[in-house]
Design a protein with these regions (language model features):
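Inhibitory N-terminal propeptides of secreted protease zymogens
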Residues: 1-153, 157-194
Length: 194
């Protein structure tokens, strides 16, 4: 039998409205704590990530127990494809605050196969080190109430939950990037690298 992998995030070529419906349906089917991908409306600073996920409010109560376990970064550079960097974080806000530096260090060490890839990696690392608004998604574990509350945050575009029997460590995870409007497809890569 073929090997199958759980996925979180849109498929290449998928219509964005179809993915948004699929993500909403996944949260509606959750009946206990679940792992979920949170994709943002725009690239956020880590401070905005913490605000959008750590003190989630529902009518009449504060929801605790939302745990960010991975922060995903992609530095926006017009008409330049930049790499997606995913940084695992322990369960505390300070680790989330330090995660752009970890992503920057990884980018510099990875470099690239071509001069352009190396230039993109260095430009991305520089912006991450400077605290850019570059977080495009997070992987969280939360209760159904927590996931529903996160869905209503103004910075959140989509929340997609994994099935309860799936492992986030074995799943392919790719956020819905802010620039995906109609269809999930790569943009141009012909712009100058700063």
């Amino acid at each position: 039998p073929p090997i199958r992998t759980d996925t979180l995030g849109p498929d290449s070529g998928e219509a964005v409205p179809d993915y948004l419906d699929r993500a909403r349906d996944s949260v509606a089917s959750v009946d206990g704590p679940a792992w979920a991908l949170v994709s943002f409306t725009k690239a956020l600073t880590v401070g905005e990530v913490i605000t959008s996920t750590s003190s989630v409010q529902v009518p009449g109560a504060e929801v605790s127990g939302v745990r960010v376990s991975r922060v995903m970064f992609r530095v926006p550079i017009e008409r330049v494809q930049t790499p997606l960097m995913s940084v695992p974080v322990p369960d505390n806000d300070e680790a989330v605050r330090r995660s752009p530096g970890v992503a920057a260090t990884r980018l510099v060490s990875l470099g690239g196969d071509t001069d352009r890839q190396q230039q993109v990696a260095l430009a991305s690392a520089k912006r991450l080190s400077a605290g850019c608004a570059c977080a495009v998604g997070v992987l969280v574990r939360a209760t159904p109430e927590g996931l529903e509350a996160i869905e209503h945050d103004s910075n959140v575009r989509a929340v997609e939950a994994l099935p309860s029997d799936a492992s986030p460590w074995l799943a392919a995870v790719r956020p819905l990037l802010p620039e995906y409007v109609d269809v999930v497809a790569p943009g141009p890569d012909d712009g100058p690298v700063p």
